[in-house]
From Swiss-Prot:
Keywords: ATP-binding, Coenzyme A biosynthesis, Cytoplasm, Kinase, Metal-binding, Nucleotide-binding, Potassium, Transferase
Originating species: Thermosipho melanesiensis (strain DSM 12029 / CIP 104789 / BI429)
Lineage of the organism: Bacteria, Thermotogati, Thermotogota, Thermotogae, Thermotogales
Assembly description: Homodimer.
Entry protein name: Type III pantothenate kinase
Family per similarity comment: Belongs to the type III pantothenate kinase family.
Keyword Isomerase found: no
Length: 247
């Protein structure tokens, strides 16, 4: 079985798969990843004890050594780390392809494989990223603060505003401080991203799939219905990358 690690700034998604179509998934805190032995002991409860490949998409380079040690010790070989330069199925039309986050690379790889040569991908993580694929060429994108960053900025930058739990909220006007914050953040993100997507479409292409992914995309499912929600997009991208480098 192949074990995939999608390492984000806050959370890491771990998935076990044989063929890249069905995933057994566990989400853990990235901060909890300290040593290969602790990681193995924790994961074997959920996934068992045997892995033949370790494939990693990481935006936290200072813990990459843990996955390399994990792979060598428990899979008997080096880990495969996802990067743009090693994937030849897409043109990376940016100044420095090596600077593209591995999570964004995985999303674009899967978008091209599963949705076609054109796509707009929005990933709701610690930061929200928007990425553009045009004629199988990655044209760049946009990075904005994510939901949690906005909440923390309000909480830390003010004397009285509370740190709220972000959850769906109906309506456009809040009746208390917490609902004010929830409505403000959710509507700002939904309307802002909608406006950006429309501008991208107008400048590049009209008929293009718009794919929302990332764990926090679930927060806005009731607000934005004219898009595709694909929560396993990045995992499939990691697996497709693995297929390309071992073929």
């Amino acid at each position: 079985m192949k074990i995939l690690f999608d390492v984000g700034n806050t959370h890491t998604t771990v998935a076990l798969t044989e063929n890249g179509k069905f995933f057994k998934i566990k989400r853990i805190s990235t901060y909890s990843i300290q040593t290969e032995d602790e990681l193995y002991a924790y994961l074997k409860v959920f996934f068992g004890e045997t892995y033949d490949e370790v494939i990693v998409s990481s935006v936290v380079p200072n813990i990459n050594h843990v996955f390399e040690f994990f792979s060598k010790k428990y899979a008997g070989k080096s880990a495969i780390f996802l990067n743009a330069q090693s994937y030849k199925g897409i043109t990376w039309n940016v100044k420095i392809p090596s600077e593209i986050g591995a999570d964004r690379v995985a999303n674009i790889i899967a978008a091209e494989r599963d949705y076609g040569k054109d796509a707009i991908v929005v990933d709701f993580g610690t930061a929200i990223t928007i990425d553009i694929l045009k004629e199988k060429s990655y044209e760049g994108g946009i990075i904005i603060p994510g939901f949690s960053m906005m909440i923390n900025a309000l909480f830390k930058g003010t004397a009285k505003l509370p740190k709220v739990e972000l959850k769906p909220f109906n309506g456009f006007i809040g009746k208390d401080t917490e609902s004010n914050i929830r409505i403000g953040i959710i509507n700002t993100v939904v309307e802002g991203i909608g406006s950006v997507i429309n501008k991208i479409k107008n400048e590049n292409f009209r008929d293009v799939p718009v794919i929302f992914t990332g764990g926090q995309s679930k927060i806005i499912m009731d607000y934005k219905r004219d898009v595709i929600y694909d929560l396993e997009l990045g995992l499939r991208g990691i697996y497709y990358f693995y297929e390309s480098v071992v073929s």
